[in-house]
Every structure is written in C-alpha cells, then in structure tokens.
Amino acid sequence: MKNISLFIALRYFKSKGQGFISFQSGMALAGIAIGVAILILVTSVMNGFERELKTRILQAIPHASIQGNISKTEVEGLSESLMLNSNVLGIAPYIETQGLLSSGTYLKGVYIFGIDPKYEKNVSTIEEHFIEGSIDSLQGNGYNLVIGDILAFQLGLTVGDSVNILVPETSLGLAGILPRTKKFKITGIFSLGAPEIDQSYVYLNTDKASKLLRIGESVHGIRIRYSNLFNAKDYIRSDL
C-alpha cells in the first residue's frame, strides 16, 4: 500500500503505445524535479546569506552597555570590576551622538561613535571588515574618521578625503549661534554588508569626540561583550 502511488505513476510513465503521453509525462517530471532543485538551492543560499549577515552584525556590535556620563578614571575601575565576571569577554568606553556629515554640497545624517580602537577590538569585530585603511588609523593626534562603504559611495568619498561633521551642540561666534562643526580626514572604509550600518555609522576617537561635544574627560558609557549573547540579560543582572 505504501508504494501504490509510485507503482501507478511508473506504470503510466513506462506504458507503451502512448509515446507522446509518456514523453509529456517525462518532461513534466523533469520540470518539477528541476523546479524543486532550484527552490531548494535558492532557499539554502538565502538562509546562508541571512545567517552570515546576522553573524556579521551581531559580532560587530556589543551585547550590552552601561550608559551615563562616566569619567575616564571611573572607566578603569568599572572595567576591572566587570572583567571579574568570567562571562565578560571585553569592555570598551564609547561616546555616541547624531549629526550631519558634510561633503561639498552633500549632507547626510549619521550616527557618530567615539571609540578607543585599543578597547573596541574587545567588543567588536568591525576591524575585520575594512576594505581600506584600518580602525587603528583612529589612534594618534589627527582628526580622523572611518565610514561605511555605502556612505562613501553615496558621497563620492575615499581614503584621504576631508569632510565636515556638524553636531547639534552650538557654538557662539561672530555670526551668532552656530552648530558646532569640525573637519575630519577619512582614514578607513569598512563594509559589514548591513546597509543600516554601512550607510549611517561613522567612527572617531573618543578623545576627538569629547572635544567635539565638549564633555571634558568623560564618556557616555561602557559597551560590553559577553561569551553568549542570548544570556546577556542574565549576565547583566548578576553584574548589577
């Protein structure tokens, strides 16, 4: 009984005297087989692409953050305390704001992140996704900036070009109250394969970010990377 459907199908498929019908059956069967094979292939490719994209994004962003104005001396003490937890793989101070990136006549709204490259490697794999320059280019005295490849394409930018960053904080000058602005040099371009990041995120050094925002010797918080992202809530509760 289990093979009755297969038996009937094969009988009609192999039947003699109806060559044209048998040919049609063969073509139909081949078409279905090819269609199913293509569907399986496309589904596998899409699932693999989605998995790779999620992995890239999750590895490039921290699992948790402690927010609040924290002095750089407090960062060291807090970091030492957090690292006592065996589930904490790394920590990194950060500064975060929003602003405008200006290049010639083009303006683009961006998320601005001040990071310390030395610590950022402990919470993010973004350094592995640079197509030009590196995250280490943010170290040093220059006002350097790294951006995503989509943003670079949209504004026609490459390594070595200069851009202006405008932030909502204001400065009082001869012309009155103006948005605070500073010129930066593009020293790196990354590509995570995630459009929401590659076209909207820019990174600079925490020292330059604190000067731009005039927040003194402090940061906006600490980002944390755990051994298991999906247990991050439990780890945070234990740390607190």
Language model: regions and residue ranges:
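N-terminal Sec/SRP start-transfer signal
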Residues: M1-V36
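Hydrophobic, regular-secondary-structure patches
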Residues: A37, L41-Y111, K121, E132-N141
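Short aromatic/hydrophobic contact patches that present stacked aromatics
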Residues: H63-S65, N144, G221-R223
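Short amphipathic alpha-helices in soluble, non-transmembrane regions
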Residues: L78-M83, I126, Y235-L240
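Mechanotransmission and gating elements of multispan inner-membrane complexes involved in transport
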Residues: E169, I177-L240
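Short acidic/glycine-enriched loop/turn elements at secondary-structure junctions
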Residues: L89, Q98-F184, K211-L213
